[in-house]
């Protein structure tokens, strides 16, 4: 339940940051899923620099709510709310949000690669291209297509994102867990 909203808020933030088109089924779904939280937050947290900060804050608050609910369910509740516990929740939410962005990027790259073969002119193509282009462009400058048509940059990007998930993100998770000691 929380994950759906977290990914919805993140997708909305990324779509606006990368100027992706919203006039498609996925864009309409993201707006329908997130408007209830983002619109009121925009009154307090306006967009700046081309970024919809309200969407990112909504994702962060949803991540905090998820972590607190899991702590309440799977532990005997908060033994005592301390500054250390608050710092753990805030840091853990930031790391989990970063992890969610990486997983979202992996899924979007896979969808874009599959749809480029199956339905290159489909209604989601422009959206997926807008979301993946900023990540694939630097790789495409260095790695040309094989035989002129086979682009391996999505695969390379997925491997790089997986490596980021395996090394720095795990280190960050361990550092956050150390806050509990």
Locations of regions flagged by a protein language model:
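Selective transmembrane helix interface/packing segments
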Residues: 1-181
């Amino acid at each position: 339940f929380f994950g759906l909203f977290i990914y919805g808020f993140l997708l909305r933030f990324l779509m606006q940051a990368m100027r992706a088109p919203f006039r498609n089924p996925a864009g309409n779904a993201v707006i329908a899923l997130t408007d209830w939280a983002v619109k009121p937050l925009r009154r307090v947290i306006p967009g700046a620099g081309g970024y919809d900060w309200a969407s990112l804050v909504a994702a962060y608050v949803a991540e905090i709510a998820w972590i607190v609910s899991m702590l309440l369910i799977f532990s005997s509740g908060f033994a005592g709310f301390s500054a250390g516990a608050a710092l753990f929740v805030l840091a853990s939410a930031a790391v989990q949000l970063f992890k969610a962005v990486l997983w979202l990027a992996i899924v979007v790259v896979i969808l874009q690669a599959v749809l480029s073969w199956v339905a290159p002119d489909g209604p989601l193509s422009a959206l997926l291209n807008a979301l993946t282009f900023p990540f694939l462009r630097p790789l495409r400058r260095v790695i040309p297509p094989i035989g002129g048509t086979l682009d391996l940059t999505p695969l390379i990007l997925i491997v790089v994102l997986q490596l980021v998930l395996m090394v720095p993100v795990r280190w960050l998770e361990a550092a956050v867990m150390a806050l509990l000691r």
